[in-house]
């Protein structure tokens, strides 16, 4: 049986990172997302600069203001977070259909079928993080292991912008020395019960019998017994069927030079073709999306008589669509190429004259 390979990706201080990306003046500042300092709400996310003051998620905004009076308090912009999350999830699904989102900024990926001797899971995780950085200008931390529990644990070990692998060689040492509060799923209430019963780290948990843990925690006790041993048989659950494949890029500065933009369209067409080839699919629709310097999103789609899968075919159509969309007086900050209506590949090469 092939050993499973699971990646857990967790974006670093996601909401705050998006705010700092979209407003560069906030970069490096103690950013606190959730609302005004005087509001009755709670903190959604705090940047690492704000966390140095003791600010953390779910803290009342009033308390955050007392701890960090010079912080930059920002109202949540869920539209921007959802849009960025959709980009990130699209990146995940360009690698595998086995994706289980846990929230806007977190997901499990089962990449077992992608791993080869020359392409270990850690390398795939590096590629995914690189794609996220290039396409969204945000950093992510990744954990790689042979089950979901250990992958999630690993993703939190070297934040921010970290990559950690837990394998059979190091799992025991990591779990035995792990503070009990750092076990995924152990909250404040559980931690207190643990401490009251002499459980302060993984070794203490490991030394408890399954019966003792069930007595203390009910059905959860069996799961805790297994976690202390690095055991987790749960599957990555994905009910989504892939309907499209695409790639986007945000330019470092706003651009209105056709030559530069079309070079990027060629690059995106190539990446999209690679992913179609990996899936052994071809597409009957091509879409080009642009986002202007004013953050207005425009898109244009073409439906095709015959499906396409090559870099050249996708570029030829994307070229036509871009020319329909462009306004030479309006710089753009993002461009994307997406193909949809997927079917099994026929590998028929076409020319631009088939589409006009």
Curated annotation (Swiss-Prot):
Binds 2 magnesium ions per subunit. Its EC number is 2.7.7.7. Keywords: Cytoplasm, DNA damage, DNA repair, DNA replication, DNA-binding, DNA-directed DNA polymerase, Magnesium, Metal-binding, Mutator protein, Nucleotidyltransferase, Transferase. Pfam families: IMS (PF00817), IMS_C (PF11799). CDD domains: PolY_Pol_IV_kappa (cd03586). The active site is at 106. It is an enzyme of class 2 (transferase). One of its GO terms (molecular function) is damaged DNA binding. GO terms for biological process: DNA-templated DNA replication; error-prone translesion synthesis; SOS response. GO terms for cellular component: cytosol. Its main location: cytoplasm. PANTHER family: DNA POLYMERASE KAPPA, DNA REPAIR POLYMERASE UMUC / TRANSFERASE FAMILY MEMBER. HAMAP family: DNApol_IV. Belongs to the DNA polymerase type-Y family. Poorly processive, error-prone DNA polymerase involved in untargeted mutagenesis. Copies undamaged DNA at stalled replication forks, which arise in vivo from mismatched or misaligned primer ends. These misaligned primers can be extended by PolIV. Exhibits no 3'-5' exonuclease (proofreading) activity. May be involved in translesional synthesis, in conjunction with the beta clamp from PolIII. NCBIfam families: PRK02406.1 (NF002677), PRK14133.1 (NF010731). This is DNA polymerase IV. The gene is dinB.
């Amino acid at each position: 049986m092939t050993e499973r390979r699971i990646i857990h990706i967790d974006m670093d201080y996601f909401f705050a990172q998006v705010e700092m990306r979209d407003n560069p003046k906030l970069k490096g500042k103690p950013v606190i997302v959730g609302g005004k300092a005087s509001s009755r709400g709670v903190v959604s996310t705090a940047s690492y600069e704000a966390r140095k003051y003791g600010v953390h998620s779910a803290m009342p905004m009033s308390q955050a203001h007392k701890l960090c009076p010079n912080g930059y308090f920002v109202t949540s912009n869920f539209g921007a977070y959802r849009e960025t999350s959709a980009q990130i999830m699209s990146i995940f699904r360009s690698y595998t259909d086995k994706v289980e989102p846990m929230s806007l900024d977190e997901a499990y990926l089962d990449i077992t079928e992608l791993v080869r001797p020359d392409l270990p899971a850690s390398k795939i995780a590096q590629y995914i993080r690189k794609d996220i950085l290039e396409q969204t200008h945000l950093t992510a931390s990744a954990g790689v292991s042979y089950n979901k529990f250990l992958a999630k644990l690993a993703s939190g070990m070297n934040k921010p912008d970290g990559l950690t692998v837990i394998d059979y060689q190091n799992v025991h040492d990591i779990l035995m020395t792990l503070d009990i509060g750092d076990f995924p799923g152990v909250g404040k209430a559980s931690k207190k019960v643990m401490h009251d019963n002499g459980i302060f780290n993984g070794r203490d948990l490991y030394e408890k019998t399954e019966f003792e843990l069930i007595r203390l925690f009910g059905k959860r006790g069996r799961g805790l017994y297994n976690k202390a041993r690095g055991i987790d048989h749960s599957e990555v659950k994905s009910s989504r069927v892939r309907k499209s494949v695409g790639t986007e890029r945000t330019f470092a500065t706003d651009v209105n030079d056709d030559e530069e933009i079309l070079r990027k369209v060629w690059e995106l067409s190539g990446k999209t073709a690679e992913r179609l080839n990996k899936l052994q699919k071809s597409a009957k629709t091509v879409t080009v999306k642009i986002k202007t310097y004013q953050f207005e999103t425009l898109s244009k789609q073409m439906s095709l008589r015959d499906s396409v899968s090559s870099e050249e075919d996708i570029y030829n159509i994307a070229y036509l669509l871009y020319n329909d969309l462009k306004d030479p007086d309006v710089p753009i900050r993002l461009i994307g190429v997406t193909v949809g209506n997927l079917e099994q590949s026929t590998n028929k090469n076409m020319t631009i004259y088939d589409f006009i």
